[in-house]
Amino acid sequence: APEIPIWETGNAAPPDELVNIYHAWDELRRTMQDYVSIVRTDNRLRRAAYRLQNLRREVKEFYWGYTLTPDILELRNLVATASLIVDSALLRKESRGSHHTLDYPNREPRFNQNTVLRKF
């Protein structure tokens, strides 16, 4: 079997201030609870998208600047997933199931399909 090369960390340093990572994690949690809960509005979703853009930049700095830890990887994946949820919710101009949008209280037949998003 081929040998897997050792992971090169480059100039990454061990996280010296874990509080920054935990604060970002808490901000993500609060953003999703406050702006992307079951009852939504376009205004709240746009606010969430803005906050997630900032978090994405911070997490990118953590990802490339620190030695990777499970917390950094999980935070990166959670921010990516949260961004997809917000983007999808902004595209769907309807209320369906347990997700109610005050701006669009009715179902729309054109959204009676899966929403597929890709981000790289």
Predicted regions and their residues:
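Glycine- and aromatic-enriched mobile tails/lids
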Residues: 1-120
